[in-house]
Regions:
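Leu/Val/Ala/Ile-rich N-terminal alpha-helices, chiefly Sec-type signal peptides and the beginnings
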Residues: 1-57
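Short, charged/polar, low-complexity loop and linker segments
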Residues: 3-7, 76-89, 113-125
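Extended alpha-helical coiled-coil "stalk/arm" regions that scaffold and mediate dimerization/assembly
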Residues: 31-39, 71, 79, 151
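Conserved alpha-helical segments that form or flank metal/cofactor-binding pockets of metalloenzymes
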Residues: 51-73
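A taxonomically broad motif for mature regions of secreted/extracellular
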Residues: 68-71, 75, 143, 147
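Short, charge/polar-rich alpha-helical segments
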Residues: 90-95
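Preference for long, well-ordered alpha-helical segments
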Residues: 100-103, 107-152
């Protein structure tokens, strides 16, 4: 199947936006979990999960905006997300965050595997995708460890 460079770049932007939206959901969910935790666990959640997700989210937003600008596409504004239905159990929110982080990582992995970033992307795009994936790679395991301790 053939495609134009413009169509392929549009697909890249759509895929990056999907992953960015998932990280926004993870941030919102972690924020909700923070409110339901004791101070010590909340501080650990902030340090081990929230800050890295926030960093990855910011990096991916900048990657999206920069790629769009460099190739003449409109820059998208990303809206904050909701943590979902309220729960008094912080593990529910952390599970939602983990699911969202894993969906973001999967979307970025599929994009990288498609070779579009190599064929029609640029160095800055590839660096942003790689840095984001490196930042979020260990977060699901960290979240599970943190919640295992919380459940005791």
């Amino acid at each position: 199947m053939s495609y134009s460079a413009g169509e392929a770049r549009g697909q890249i932007l759509d895929d990056v936006a999907e992953a960015t939206d998932q990280l926004a959901l993870a941030l919102a969910s972690l924020g909700e979990a923070y409110e339901e935790l004791d101070v010590q666990t909340a501080d650990a959640l902030e340090e081990q999960l929230f800050r890295p997700v926030q960093s990855a989210y910011g990096r991916l937003r900048r990657t999206h905006a920069g790629f769009a600008e460099r190739h003449g596409f409109p820059v998208r504004e990303f809206a904050p997300s909701s943590g979902g239905l309220h729960s008094a159990d912080p593990r529910v929110y952390v599970d939602r965050a983990v699911d969202a982080i894993e969906r973001a990582d999967h979307a970025l992995a599929e994009l990288q595997d498609s070779m579009l970033p190599v064929e029609v992307g640029d160095r800055e795009l590839r660096a942003g995708l790689s840095e984001t994936r490196s930042t979020i790679a260990e977060l699901p395991a960290r979240a599970r460890r943190l919640m295992r301790v919380q459940g005791r």
